[in-house]
Each structure stands twice: as C-alpha cells, then as structure tokens.
C-alpha cells in the first residue's frame, strides 16, 4: 500500500520494524504524517492507532479514509487555481479556510507540491504533483489504520496518555540537539520532538517502544543500553556504522 502523500522523511527500515512488531499486534504509533510506515504495517495485519497532535494532519486523514474519491474531486477542482504566489501564501494560511474538505484538499496539494514534503515550508516543486499523485489518492484503501488526534502539544505526555497497547512506535526521522528552539512558533503540520526527553522516557517505560531514526552519531551513545539495528541506504541490515543509513531502536 503506497500512501498518496509525499513523505517528508522516507524510511527504508520498515522490514526491521515488522520483525520487531509481530502481525496481529495492536500498536500506538506517534508522529503520524505521510502514513508511509503506518499504512505498510496496517496492510500486513497490525492494528495501527496513528497519533498526531496536529489537527491539520488528522483532518486530512479522516477525509481520505472517509471518502477518498470526494477528496480527489475537491483537490482536482482547486489545484488549477493555485499559482506560484498563492502556493507560498497558502503555506501560512491554508488552515484558515472554513471548509474542512477544502483544507484537506489543500493539504494534499501543498504536500505533493512542496520540495520538503511539508505543507508549511519548502520550495514549489510541481513535478511531484501529477496524474500519478491523483491515482494514488483514489486507490488508497487500507484496513486497520485509525487516525487519533492528541490535543496535548507535549508528545511524551500523549504517549503516556494513550490507550494501553503492547507496542509503541515512533518514526522520528532526523535527530537534532534541539538548540535555539525555545520560543519558536510551531507550524500546523510539524510536531516538536525533544530527543533527550524521548530517550529518557524510552529508558523508563514499561511499554515496548520502537524508534525509527536516520543515522546520527549521538544516537549510539544516547541509546547504548538498547537494541539498535542498522540498515544501509538500500534497507539491507548492516553492522558497519559507516554504511548505516537508518537506525531502529527498541527497548526490548
């Protein structure tokens, strides 16, 4: 199952995650965005409770799963009206439209048209918005995927408050030291992650937690007590840190 959204962070380590989280498991997954990871796990028999604390993301997915054809029609109607100047205006303003289906359609258009895969930022890249994108939108049909809107801005608090499941998954993506972030405004489609706080939570949690990260040297020390599995740029398992592209980290 291929998601209709462009991934802001694309993962090659889903096979590793599938080995850690068995089929028929119930999973709370956080940082839900493109659905790349969650849809793949749902399509192979895992019940995915896909959490986001950004309403715009939740709203898009609810419209997609409720009636993908209606969403495709709305996107096809509005897309020709968006010129270059309006694209950059909408990056800051699309959430202010009153019509929910229009907002969801704009989310899809802006995501596919953004060089970053983020609706709120990136350069205009029209090559990614083509007939194939509409085809993916119309074809997307997956069971066992349930979007959940978390109202707390604190990611870790939302994890603690979630309904009890055996597994918790976080496709985090890129690591940072969270420098100079205090007081910065938050985009409508970006969830802040405080990586050291997350590591502390993982170390103390009774839940089985799986993290997906792009390679970063700091992670080897931060998670030295945990199970770290590496894959290369082609998704193949490797023990060579020099060839490591992604890291899957588990506290079990």
Predicted regions span which residues?
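Conserved S-adenosyl-L-methionine
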Residues: 10, 16-82
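Short His-Asn-centered micro-motif
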Residues: 29-33, 51-52, 148-151, 170-172, ...
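Short loop/helix-cap segments at secondary-structure boundaries that form the rim of catalytic
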Residues: 40-44, 139-140, 218-225
């Amino acid at each position: 199952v291929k998601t209709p959204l462009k991934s802001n962070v694309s993962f090659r380590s889903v096979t590793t995650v599938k080995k850690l989280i068995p089929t028929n498991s119930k999973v709370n997954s956080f940082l839900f965005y493109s659905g790349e990871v969650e849809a793949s796990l749902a399509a192979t028999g895992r019940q995915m409770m896909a959490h986001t604390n950004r309403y715009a993301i939740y709203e898009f997915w609810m419209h997609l799963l409720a009636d993908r054809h209606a969403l495709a029609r709305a996107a096809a109607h509005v897309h020709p009206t968006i010129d270059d100047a309006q694209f950059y205006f909408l990056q800051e303003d699309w959430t202010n439209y009153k019509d929910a289906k229009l907002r969801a359609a704009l989310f899809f258009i802006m995501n596919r048209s953004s060089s970053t895969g983020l609706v709120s930022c990136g350069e205009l890249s029209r090559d990614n918005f083509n007939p194939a994108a509409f085809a993916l939108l119309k074809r997307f049909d997956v069971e066992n995927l349930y979007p959940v809107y978390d109202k707390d801005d604190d990611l870790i608090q939302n994890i603690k408050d979630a309904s009890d499941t055996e597994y918790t998954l976080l496709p985090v993506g890129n690591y940072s030291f969270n420098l100079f972030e205090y007081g910065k405004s938050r985009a409508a489609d970006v969830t802040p992650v405080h990586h050291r706080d997350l590591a502390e939570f993982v170390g103390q949690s009774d839940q089985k937690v799986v993290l997906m990260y792009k390679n970063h040297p700091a992670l080897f020390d931060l998670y030295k007590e945990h199970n770290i599995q590496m894959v290369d740029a082609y998704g193949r398992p490797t023990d060579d840190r020099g060839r490591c592209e992604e890291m899957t980290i588990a506290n079990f």
